[in-house]
Structures are given as C-alpha cells and as structure tokens.
C-alpha cells in the first residue's frame, strides 16, 4: 500500500509544523574548530600558570586536577592532556576563567610598568644626583633623604670606577619598597 504525498504531510505531528517558523542558526565547521582551538589555547594558558596564580582562577575540581596533571606531564602526553582540557572547557562556561586570567595578566602588566618607572627614577637619580631627590620626596614623602643621597653617591662612585652596580640595585630595591608602602 503506497502512501501519497498528502498522506505524509498528514502524518507530521502538530508540534513539528511550528518548528519551520523558528530560525535555525547555522555555525560553520571552521567556526566550531576555531572556538575549540581558542579553548585549547585557554587551557594551555592555565597549564602555564604557576601554583599561586592557578589558585586565583575559578576552576571546578575536575578541571583543576586535569590542569595540575598537565603541568606534571611532558611531551606527547601533555598535548593529549591539553586536548582533554579544551574538551572540558567546551562543556563549561569559559568566561569567568578568561576574566580571571585577564585580571592576572593586567596585574602583571601594571607591575612591569611600575618597575620601568622605578628604573627610570633610579637612572635619573644616578645621572642627575641630588637635583632629583626633591622629586622623589614629593612622590614618596616618607622616604629617607639621607639614605637616598648616600645610595646615590655610592652608585655614582661605582659607575665612575666601572664597578658592579651594587648601589644602583639597592636604590631600585629602596624605591620599590617605597612604592609598595605607598600603595
């Protein structure tokens, strides 16, 4: 017994007829691959983090265990473990993890910028001498003028005698301590 075309249409349940009105969003295979690769890269970033930084990232127990295992594995096993971490991330919302990583990277960038600023201050102190000390005291009012001037004089003597820059390092450490106590 053959069914006619009209009979096939009559056999369709009512709720499936309404599905034709719903918009279907097609995602290309390439886009799916790009997203999977991005999540695998996110997993690789997690694996490259240190233990303290990893504790600041909101991860569930399974994902944290997989990341810690990947940190211990070498060679080909590591690649497979990274793929597993990427797969685990696809099943989760990666947004909070990415946000936490961005915050960590931003904090690192701020610290690098501060170190560059302190290096420039140190170099100015060594080159220009006591003329820069009032500028330092304006930035860091609790700085010890006498200690700073002593370190600057020693650094200038070391530079003139082509000795290792021990006092220059001490100036940088002192400026870093001042910056940390100011914050």
From Swiss-Prot:
Pfam families hit by this protein: DarP
InterPro entries referenced in this protein's UniProt entry, alphabetically? DarP, DarP_sf
Keywords of this protein's UniProt record, alphabetized? Answer: Cytoplasm, Ribosome biogenesis, RNA-binding, rRNA-binding
Task: Give its localization.
Answer: Cytoplasm
**For this UniProt entry, what's an example GO CC term?**
cytosol
Molecular function terms from GO: ribosome binding; rRNA binding
What residue spans carry the region label Disordered?
1-20
The keyword Phosphoprotein belongs to this UniProt entry's keyword annotation: no
Its job: Member of a network of 50S ribosomal subunit biogenesis factors which assembles along the 30S-50S interface, preventing incorrect 23S rRNA structures from forming. Promotes peptidyl transferase center (PTC) maturation.
Family note: Belongs to the DarP family.
Q: What is this protein called?
A: Dual-action ribosomal maturation protein DarP
Gene name, please? Answer: darP
């Amino acid at each position: 017994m053959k069914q006619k075309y009209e009979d096939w249409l009559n056999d369709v349940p009512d709720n499936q007829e309404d599905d034709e009105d719903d918009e279907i969003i097609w995602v290309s295979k390439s886009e799916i691959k790009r997203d999977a690769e991005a999540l695998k890269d996110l997993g690789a970033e997690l694996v490259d983090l240190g233990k303290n930084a990893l504790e600041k990232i909101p991860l569930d127990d399974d994902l944290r265990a997989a990341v810690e295992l990947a940190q211990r594995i070498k060679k080909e096993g590591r690649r497979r473990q990274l793929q597993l971490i990427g797969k685990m991330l696809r099943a989760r919302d990666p947004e909070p993890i990415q946000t936490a990583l961005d915050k960590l990277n931003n904090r690192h960038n701020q610290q690098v910028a501060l170190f560059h600023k302190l290096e420039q201050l140190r170099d100015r102190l060594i080159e220009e001498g006591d003329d820069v000390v009032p500028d330092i005291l304006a930035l860091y009012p609790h700085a010890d003028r006498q200690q700073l001037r002593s370190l600057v004089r020693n650094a200038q003597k070391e530079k003139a005698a082509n000795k290792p820059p021990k006092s220059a390092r001490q100036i940088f450490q002192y400026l870093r301590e001042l910056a940390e106590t100011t914050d």
